[in-house]
Amino acid sequence: QDLPGNDYSTATLCLGHHAVPNGTLVKTITDDQIEVTNATELVQSSSTGKICNNPHRILDGRDCTLIDALLGDPHCDVFQDETWDLFVERSNAFSNCYPYDVPDYASLRSLVASSGTLEFITEGFTWTGVTQNGGSNACKRGPNSGFFSRLNWLTKSGSTYPVLNVTMPNNDNFDKLYIWGVHHPSTNQEQTNLYVQASGGVTVSTRRSQQTIIPNIGSRPWVRGQSGRISIYWTVVKPGDVLVINSNGNLIAPRGYFKMRTGKSSIMRSDAPIDTCISECITPNGSIPNDKPFQNVNKITYGACPKYVKQNTLKLATGMRNVPEKQTRGLFGAIAGFIENGWEGMIDGWYGFRHQNSEGTGQAADLKSTQAAIDQINGKLNRVIEKTNEKFHQIEKEFSEVEGRIQDLEKYVEDTKIDLWSYNADVLVALENQHTIDLTDSEMNKLFERTRRQLRENAEDMGNGCFKIYHKCDNVCIESIRNGTYDHDVYRDEALNNRFQIKGVELKSGYKDWILWISFAISCFLLCVVLLGFIMWACQRGNIRCNICI
């Protein structure tokens, strides 16, 4: 089409931004679904299916629970003096010694797990007047009867069981964990056969605490040929404190102490295999990468892990608003500005220029505005990770049956925390996405304003992101506009002259329409005047008569 001014004496310059055929939908504060050119998934929703043994030291419990390894169950002797960052308990773990219970099982398990060691120091307890090293067929060590290796079962010597009173000071500079127990015979006959007295008792004291346990004699369900039970207790002795043990029967005595350590070791129930690999974050499902700020694999974690949320997906915008390129783009064919649509195929930048002049058409990216936008977006993912990643482990919570209400409260608190973090994650990502879209739009507007200030009166804003340049602007001229060296004074006279000529032609073309409309209006007015005059003349002559009735 041969339009006025669309010749070699003018040029068209359009500004635009990158676009893709199929963008990604993200959520912002103002819009639940807005399309962007690129986005990054923030929720880790799958695990590797295996537990990595690096950088954390993983100890596979195999068929032993941590408490069985602590007590010295014969089939758990391989764990003596072991250390770990994470002790992995398996679902097929079992006890293979005298049946026992731990009244405060969860606390003992947690205490030992966090210590990260089963280092045991034997001490010289003196038990006078009793028989030591009792055993049971329920706890065989090889072909012989045995017992827990870390405990000493004391029974009568001959026909006597004297009152025992033993003290053991802690002269070291660390806490000591003593494990001891009380035997509950199944019958009164068994009680007197083992301990002489019809009713024994055990008292274990320190300066800070005291525990007195009276045996509960009675038959219980048979386990490994035994209807009696042993209750396991524990006492922590601080540096400078003293352990005091008093008993007149039924005592399962300690052989020494476990050296307590402070740290961030833990325990986890999992059947995932352990493999040689590297991962900072471990869940019961297996290790997961920690390069995302959120995960919905498992609530239980160990290591530096993403925060657990309920959402399956949260996408962080890492590109600009996507406006796919239209197939038809107006009078200039391939030339259209950012207000109409984006440009597909821009591989060297996010923002750029397209031009049409006497030498043809061309395209080039604007690296300055592109880099400015990228610099602001690049740090977003790392900042979100820093705000949300756990630098500690979320341990399993266990409570005994009598602590059911505490367990319910704990579950409510944990669920509330997850709800809050899920909501916070949603808002945080929406805010970041809103900021990304706003800043990328802002860079586009900055580039447009910078170009407009350069061209001044030498060009006219066409309203679609393009400028009509009213002077001859070859490729060198176009390049000067792009790199900011354009001198509008050089082209000012030519641009003004061409602008007046083009506007003049447009003005003359417009006058024809005005003249036609004015002529038509005057003709209609004159016709009405003549017709009205004829009617009045006829009325005066009597040729026309008008009757007006009310």
Swiss-Prot record:
A Pfam family hit:
Hemagglutinin
Keyword Membrane carried by entry: yes
Q: How does it sit in the membrane?
A: Single-pass type I membrane protein
* Any one GO biological process: clathrin-dependent endocytosis of virus by host cell
One Gene Ontology MF term? host cell surface receptor binding
Write out the GO cellular component annotations.
host cell plasma membrane; membrane; viral envelope; virion membrane
Q: Which residues lie on this side of the membrane: Cytoplasmic?
A: 536-550
- Give me the disulphide-bonded residues: C14-C466, C52-C277, C64-C76, C97-C139, C281-C305, C473-C477
Q: Which residues lie on this side of the membrane: Extracellular?
A: 1-514
In terms of Gene3D superfamilies, this protein maps to: 3.90.20.10, 3.90.209.20
Tell me, how does this one assemble? Homotrimer of disulfide-linked HA1-HA2.
Name the UniProt record assigns to this protein? Hemagglutinin
Organism field: Influenza A virus (strain A/Duck/Hokkaido/9/1985 H3N8)
Q: What is the lineage of its organism?
A: Viruses, Riboviria, Orthornavirae, Negarnaviricota, Polyploviricotina
Gene name linked to the record? HA
